[in-house]
Design a protein with these regions (language model features):
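A short, charged/proline- and glycine-enriched loop
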Residues: 56-62
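Short amphipathic alpha-helical face segments that pack within enzyme cores
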Residues: 69-73
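TOPRIM fold recognition
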Residues: 76-165
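Basic, glycine-enriched DNA-binding surface that flanks or lies within the catalytic cores of DNA
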Residues: 1-56
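Cytosolic beta-strand hydrophobic patch enriched in CBS
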Residues: 16-19, 63, 88-90
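Helix N-cap/beta->alpha junction signal
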Residues: 66-67, 117
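Conserved catalytic motifs of the protein kinase core domain
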Residues: 12, 60, 110
Length: 165
């Protein structure tokens, strides 16, 4: 919150995830409803998808997710040294933020594709993997997405994806 990347909208109290360009200018905002009965999700008009919600670390790894909440859920399950790695949420099944991050961070040598465990997510994982000319691996959540994996792990089920970090 101190970096102004997540905040609460004043109108509907949505969580807003902000993506910045390499000059620190906000270029993308994704809203997600915070009320259980409200599953609202959407990008703010005029958002540039190549700058969607992301975190730049210093390691050679980047993890790409469909949604910011999945990215944060994954980090919650893998807290140790999480700041070292880079993470991005496409806010869709697009690869634009990934290729922007690769362009901005030439030290990245390993891509982990972490889209949802559904047809759209897995099709996107394969499509993007085919485009990459660097080391990549597809990580599939056990349940529908990484947020569900976190929810179930908090209920006592085994956490997912130990080997990655």
């Amino acid at each position: 919150m101190r970096r102004k990347i997540i905040y609460e909208s004043s109108d509907f109290h949505n969580a807003v995830f902000v993506g910045y360009d390499s000059n620190g200018i906000p270029r993308h905002a994704h809203k997600r409803g915070t009320v259980t009965s409200n599953s609202y999700k959407g990008n703010v008009a005029g958002s540039q998808p190549e700058f969607s919600f992301h975190w730049h670390g210093k390691s050679d790894k980047i993890f790409l997710f469909e949604a910011p909440i999945d990215m944060l859920s994954f980090v919650s399950m893998h807290k140790e040294n999480w700041q070292e790695h880079s993470y991005a949420a496409s806010c869709s099944v697009s690869d634009r933020v990934l290729f922007q991050c690769l362009n901005d961070n030439t030290n990245i040598k390993n891509v982990f594709l972490c889209f949802d465990n559904d047809e759209a997510g897995q099709t996107a994982n394969k499509r993007i993997a085919d485009k990459l000319n660097i080391q990549n691996e597809i990580l599939v959540p056990t349940y529908k997405d990484w947020n569900e994996d976190l929810t179930f792990s908090e209920k006592g089920d085994e956490p997912i994806c130990h080997q990655v970090l």
